[in-house]
A protein has these predicted regions:
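Active-site beta-loop-alpha junctions enriched in small/polar residues
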Residues: 29, 56, 78-84, 148-150, ...
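Active-site gating loops and adjacent loop-to-helix segments of metal-dependent hydrolytic enzymes
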Residues: 90-115, 246-253
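Structural preference for beta-strand elements that scaffold enzyme active sites
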Residues: 21-23, 48-52, 72-78, 142-146, ...
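Acidic (Asp/Glu)-rich catalytic clusters
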Residues: 12-14, 39-45, 62-74, 91-104, ...
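Catalytic domains of cell-wall/extracellular-matrix polysaccharide-remodeling enzymes
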Residues: 121, 125-213, 222
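C-terminal domain-boundary segment and adjacent tail
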Residues: 174-177, 249-301
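A short alpha/beta connector and helix-capping loop motif
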Residues: 33-58
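N-terminal pre-catalytic segment of deacetylase/amide-hydrolase enzymes
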Residues: 1-23
Length: 301
């Protein structure tokens, strides 16, 4: 269980308690070339600070090579157990016969777990460790872990604790935020006193019209509370490849990802940060704090 102490996470990072700190985090690297190209350009521009990689996906080798050649890039793993696209699919890293409950009749991850209630927690751990080992073997040195579609966060205590166990084994922090505690109380009871817990999260909501995209993010920045907030984004280029890969729906599709890319590499975002006295940080900083907490035995609030 998370135990409160006098120090906030911001203070553990060396900032005053009232500081407003954000991680701008790009999800889904490795999914397509258009996502990889947009996300890495955004990272290099400096306003997107962190990202996570999908090891089972077809374009993971490309982003793994990028990680090797850019060792300072703040990259984690986007632990993946679903394959939500209609025609663009992926399956397990572990041998199929070791994780049968995770795979459909064609050997792909399920589109949606709601259609399969037989997910085996032991097989989930086998697959998560396989993804970790594949990434490490290809030169990726992750700074953190998170969960594609939040499946490991929001699918019950047992699977969350599998993710937590894997994270502890590899000495990595995971993306979890206090915003989720009310709806998923097992998160708070499962986390240990030395686990990193972010304060808030922001992500684009389905149904926001394209013309309201900047307003949504600018409002979130104006209303930002003190503490550490992760803004989860999904950058990509609205090109033929990404349109084909995501054609079954507009949500998190090619145009959606282009809008995220445009806003977070544009002047409006840069000016908003300066105007609101908001500081960009990375998961690498949190990873160092996590290592320090584990070594010292101190606790964050």
């Amino acid at each position: 269980m998370v135990v409160a102490s006098a120090q906030t996470l911001a203070e553990r990072l060396g900032y005053p308690p009232g500081a407003k700190l954000i991680i701008v985090h790009a999800d889904d690297l490795g999914e397509t070339h258009a996502v990889d190209a947009a996300a890495t350009k955004a990272l290099e521009g400096g306003m997107v600070t962190s990202a996570s990689l999908m090891v089972p996906c077809p374009w993971f080798p490309e982003i793994a090579d990028y990680a090797k050649s850019h060792p300072d890039a703040d990259l984690g793993l986007h632990l993946t157990l679903t394959s939500e696209r209609v025609y663009y699919r992926w399956g397990s890293v572990a041998p199929a016969d070791k994780v049968p409950s995770l795979l459909d009749d064609n050997g792909y991850f399920y589109h949606d777990w709601a259609k399969n209630e037989a997910i085996n927690a032991k097989e989930v751990e086998i697959e998560l460790r396989a993804q970790m080992e594949r990434a490490l073997s290809m030169g990726v040195r992750p700074t953190h872990l998170d969960s594609h579609q939040y499946r490991l966060i929001m699918s019950g205590k047992e699977l969350f604790e599998v993710m937590l166990r894997v994270a502890h084994a590899y000495k990595l922090p995971i993306f979890v935020t206090r915003d989720w505690f009310a709806e998923y109380p097992y998160l708070q009871t499962s986390l240990g006193p030395n686990d990193i817990v972010l304060d808030h999260t922001v992500t684009m909501e389905p149904g926001i019209p394209a013309e309201k995209w900047p307003e949504f993010y600018l409002t979130a920045l104006r209303n930002l509370k003190p503490g550490v907030t992760e803004i989860v984004i999904h950058p990509g280029y609205d090109d033929e490849e990404l349109r084909a890969a995501t054609r079954e729906r507009s949500t998190w599709g090619a145009a959606w990802r282009q809008r995220d890319y445009d806003f977070f590499t544009g002047d409006e975002f840069r000016q908003a940060l300066a105007g609101q006295n908001i500081k960009l940080i990375t998961w690498r900083e949190l990873s160092r704090a996590y290592a320090s907490l584990a070594k010292s035995g101190k606790k964050t609030e």
